[in-house]
UniProtKB/Swiss-Prot annotation:
Gene: phnW
Keywords: Aminotransferase, Pyridoxal phosphate, Pyruvate, Transferase
Entry GO MF terms: 2-aminoethylphosphonate-pyruvate transaminase activity
Protein name: 2-aminoethylphosphonate--pyruvate transaminase
Alphabetical GO biological process terms: organic phosphonate catabolic process
Subunit structure: Homodimer.
Catalytic activity line of the entry: (2-aminoethyl)phosphonate + pyruvate = phosphonoacetaldehyde + L-alanine
Cofactor: pyridoxal 5'-phosphate
SUPFAM superfamilies recorded: PLP-dependent transferases
PANTHER family noted in UniProt: 2-AMINOETHYLPHOSPHONATE--PYRUVATE TRANSAMINASE (PTHR42778:SF1)
Length: 367
């Protein structure tokens, strides 16, 4: 391990501000009102307000990574007679399928392939053919490829068919404007270390209270019981059932302040979009091609085809970039040789320009 700090060009954990890091220098007592009422309850309220201005929603914080919250929702929201349609076009949709299988939850997996956007007409046909489906679950920003999925159109279907709608917005909430009530979302799942630009340690669920109240006694897990976590926070003014990740929570509270100072989600989205467009233009000028067509891209992360030169090795390319202070992501696409570059976190236009210069220097196979 080196003491040198790198610019993380990843979908999270990501580069955070100095002030977010400094917020973790304070030690909090998990029983103290200053922490539970003054910090946790404020975060819950702010998250709900970021998600929608409509009444009837609440926020629940849960220890662990984003996948813990996804599993908590699936394991708590679906009863023994329920069935979920899981829309999958990448590793994170596939992870939901795996979770449902391990928990014994009835499910229909619609997998449209990693480089295709889900076909809304195909989803319509599945719902029409199988009235036993009670829930729909899908990923918004699929970071396997950088695909942005059509949660608005699928939400319209969920509303029309009367289905409970679960959206994994891990790498989009806080970075892409949305109104979850208008999108007919019943459960939105995200994480502290993504677009709000906090650090890892907890995830959160923003849910329709009426749906959440119906989850009592359903959970397949003690620790991941979403209803029990919600009731504990409601009844005890922000207290967590089990040990709260206090330092991460303080960092997140600071990150929310910095999101507001930047101008809110709309301003952050604009920065992310400009970062991504500048990155793609610069990479194409260097001879790299994107895995996806431009209209399919999210402003979060972009997958690029690896060079076909026989001398190219991702490990060597990565090492040379890291020496210059930049960390990128390996590929996760099963059918294509790719690498990925994220552009969220404390990343600005000057950073993208510096990255492109570093990439040019690191292209040893062209020398």
């Amino acid at each position: 391990m080196t003491s040198r700090n790198y610019l993380l060009l990843t979908p999270g954990p990501l580069t955070t501000s100095r002030t977010v890091k400094e917020a973790m220098l304070f030690d909090s007592c998990t029983w103290d009102d200053d922490y539970n009422i003054g910090v946790v309850e404020q975060i819950r309220q702010q998250l709900t307000e970021l998600a929608t201005a409509s009444e009837g929603y609440t926020s629940v914080l849960l220890q662990g990574s984003g996948s813990y919250a996804v599993e908590a929702v699936l394991g708590s929201a679906l009863g023994p007679q329920d069935k979920v349609l899981i829309v999958s076009n990448g590793a994170y949709g596939a992870r939901m399928v795996e979770m449902a299988g391990l928990m014994g939850i009835a499910h229909h997996a619609y997998d449209c392939g990693e480089v295709a956007r889900p076909d809304v007409q195909a989803i319509d046909a599945i719902l029409n053919a199988d009235p036993t489906i009670s829930h729909i679950a899908m990923v918004h920003s699929e970071t396997t490829t950088g695909m942005l999925n059509p949660i608005d159109e699928v939400g319209t279907l969920a509303h029309r068919y009367g289905k409970t709608y679960i959206v994994d917005a891990m790498s989009s909430f806080g970075g892409i404007p949305m109104d979850i009530a208008a999108l007919h979302i019943d459960y939105l799942i995200s994480s502290a270390n993504k677009c709000i630009q906090g650090v890892p340690g907890f995830a959160f669920v923003i849910a329709r209270e009426q749906k959440l109240a119906a989850c009592k006694g359903r959970s397949r897990s003690l620790s991941l019981d979403l209803y029990a976590q919600w009731r504990c926070m409601e009844d005890n003014h922000g207290k967590w059932r089990f040990t709260s990740p206090t330092h991460t929570v303080l960092a997140f509270a600071q990150a929310l302040k910095e999101l507001a100072k930047e101008g809110g989600v709309a301003a952050r989205h604009q920065r992310y979009q400009q970062n991504q467009r500048s990155l793609v233009a610069g990479m194409r000028a260097l001879g790299f091609n994107t895995l996806l067509d431009d209209e399919l891209h999210s402003p979060i992360i972009t997958a690029f085809y690896s060079p076909e030169d026989p001398q190219y090795r991702f490990s060597e390319f990565y090492r040379r970039l890291k020496e210059q202070g930049f960390v990128i992501y390996p590929g996760k696409v099963s059918q294509s040789d790719c690498f990925r570059i994220g552009n969220i976190g404390e990343v600005y236009a000057a950073d993208i320009t510096a990255l492109l210069t570093a990439i040019r220097t690191a292209m040893y196979w062209t020398k």
